[in-house]
């Protein structure tokens, strides 16, 4: 026989399935529970998608520096994806370099004290058995499941191509790790093209274009706790981030490029700025932490040399907070792409360290070979890492001169 379990009320009221835990940040007020209802439920072999409606009533609240907003009632659509984890966890990689976001766990064995271990967050990139010999010989092979980002159809059409290019800018890094066509982006399908596609289905990594006055973007790394495998991704780009990019470009490149003086920047320049923002956020979603040493390796003369910049960019890592090449002087002639930071040698090393499948008969031997490979690589100072959590919080007396944030 079979049993029918009523979970409707649980789905409607479970805190993680509502906006209650972020209601203060969103300033949406209190949820009107009596108005909660489930619009749709879709079931698949390995996941359940729930489309629920919530209603929140805000109250007049005085926030310093902001006018008092009148109370209002707002309708919110929420999407929930409950997904089975893989029966076979991804082989974990010990977090011993600082380069990656990590997750810690307590490991128990027999009656021994628990050992705390940290593993990096990364995507599952695996190869087919028939490709293993070619891969170990150094040939590029395609992963079983590449990382494919889907682009919000609300994104302005003129930015779609540069968003795709920004994602593909990580391909050379994955090629260093032995993978061909490991990462890509495409426009999200319409309902007619794929009725099963949903932006709240964690099966589909998504790049969301948000209409907001927020001058920012974000790239989270939700992962499963057994192995650190990244199992979902929802990058957010706030449209107003271009306002911030314009200010940076004016302040940092205005002496070299008269275009920076315009109130509205030309499309060619905006495309480069979008690519800079998104490539950085994609780096986060691949597992990479900020590296504030990325902008410390090149001399002023190198930063003014177009040929050098074409090969190495303005820093070793796009995961630094350096934005524009303000070492340029009015007479310097450099390509537009050489006025901003791009994927650098550190980023390529980091992807190879985290994603390459190293030889070995078991996980322990593969981890040993990864460590030996990295020991040799670390002889190159441009591959060094300094996260410092956030260097803004570190006293200047504890900072070496080259460990500065948002600086060349």
For every predicted segment, state its role.
Residues 160-163, 173, 219-221, 234-235, ...:
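Short, solvent-exposed loop/turn and secondary-structure capping segments
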Residues 1-155, 173, 188-245, 249-267, ...:
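Auxiliary tRNA-acceptor-end handling modules of aminoacyl-tRNA synthetases
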Residues 156-182:
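Zn2+-dependent metallopeptidase catalytic core
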Residues 398-401, 405-408:
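Single conserved hydrophobic/aromatic residue that forms the stacking wall/gate
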Residues 238-268, 277, 336-364:
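Polar, glycine-rich mid-to-C-terminal structural blocks
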